[in-house]
Amino acid sequence: MRINPTTSGSEVSAVEKKNLGRIVKIIGPVLDVAFPPGKMPNIYNALVVQGRDNEQTNVTCEVQQLLGNNRVRAVAMSDTDGLMRGMGVIDTGAPISVPVGGSTLGRIFNVLGQPVDNLGPVDTNTTSPIHRSAPAFIQLDTKLSIFETGIKVVDLLAPYRRGGKIGLFGGAGVGKTVLIMELINNIAKAHGGVSVFGGVGERTREGNDLYLEMKESGVINEENIPESKVALVYGQMNEPPGARMRVGLTALTMAEYFRDVNEQDVLLFIDNIFRFVQAGSEVSALLGRMPSAVGYQPTLSTEMGSLQERITSTKEGSITSIQAVYVPADDLTDPAPATTFAHLDATTVLSRGLAAKGIYPAVDPLDSTSTMLQPRIVGEEHYETAQRVKQTLQRYKELQDIIAILGLDELSEEDRLTVARARKIERFLSQPFFVAEVFTGSPGKYVGLAETIRGFQLILSGELDGLPEQAFYLVGNIDEATAKAMNLKT
């Protein structure tokens, strides 16, 4: 860790004497800068543009190419309006560095690690560069272990891997934000962990809504900011491509500190990973690289790998990443989502049909998948229960057309029993969330994996066939469902 040269006035003045360049060309967010012979900055160094009277501007750039003739090409992290040829540029001698540690919790940052929430400066001198190598193989924790979320449908049917990567697929209004906030809340309570949210190329309105909802639900503690459970890093879609391309690395750098130094389990959200690829494509075109398939950058796999390989478990702690994935034109073979899928351990698909039925979380039990759902990892009992639940729901799905046309009475006795159990399972997959308490008035429930398996086994065995299906709706464990059934009878 080191003090960030871009934020320390004394260091900037020292660097200024050594290595001052001049802008020779400006093309949108791309600057060409000439330096004295023998004083060329390294690739990824941060450059700070000086104003007319040698005052520092707010424009920081990152070196991307060495052009020859003592010139470099850099990409700006903010608007280049007002810049002119001949302006001075300071080579800071290091990559962009951002604040890390507990003081980042409850705050909102931009790509440079500067707070943008009007709550004053961040109380820390510890910073870390956003460009780092992935952990060495010897540091990795290779044990396959389940990351328990306390959410029944996730833990049973598409379990998350500790230190794994999960793709979150869902449109607007199906409960993606609430699911994200519940995961942030549960990891803090059950694992003593923290979360980092990276808003990559998202709408400013959505970022603002998320911040306000987090304050309302207590994920961000307004009374005592350091007691918050999440740090937010935003690079909105109105910002230059350089900022959108690097904001994911800023969020990841903050998460790495919690993993490596504080030895915590960290949850890293990236919304949306497609925007990271899109920003890289824009930068690639601006730098004059020849486009690859479908117009994407030729370095697509390398850029994705450099981000994804840093998201992993080490012997100190873990970073479990949940990434929202936008699929352009619903084409799963598009290079951007196809490259992302290669890195995912699990997919959580949110269904508009389930949301319309009022079943929350609206996770589709048949479309969601996980590489962890294997007998040798989760055990025979968990695997068998999950498979039987899926088989029952699949059979119910197949029978729905017959039910719609002919009605339940035309089904065989066995199929009627399957439908009754499937409807109970569907409702039991719903669950009241802690972060939704302020909206629903129902207390949130955290359900352990063993309790989840026991509940579904009882439904599948037929022991609860006599209970009404509404008793299983929005409850925690199976004991609450039986108690609710008794209340319904009285």
UniProtKB/Swiss-Prot annotation:
GO terms for cellular component: chloroplast thylakoid membrane; mitochondrion; proton-transporting ATP synthase complex. Keywords: ATP synthesis, ATP-binding, CF(1), Chloroplast, Hydrogen ion transport, Ion transport, Membrane, Nucleotide-binding, Plastid, Thylakoid, Translocase, Transport. GO terms for biological process: proton motive force-driven mitochondrial ATP synthesis. ATP binds at residues 170-177. It catalyses: ATP + H2O + 4 H(+)(in) = ADP + phosphate + 5 H(+)(out). Its EC number is 7.1.2.2. It is found in: Plastid, Chloroplast thylakoid membrane. The keyword Nucleotide-binding applies. It holds the Pfam family ATP-synt_ab_N. Disulfide bonds: none annotated. F-type ATPases have 2 components, CF(1) - the catalytic core - and CF(0) - the membrane proton channel. CF(1) has five subunits: alpha(3), beta(3), gamma(1), delta(1), epsilon(1). CF(0) has four main subunits: a(1), b(1), b'(1) and c(9-12). Produces ATP from ADP in the presence of a proton gradient across the membrane. The catalytic sites are hosted primarily by the beta subunits. Belongs to the ATPase alpha/beta chains family. This is ATP synthase subunit beta, chloroplastic. It comes from Ipomoea wrightii.
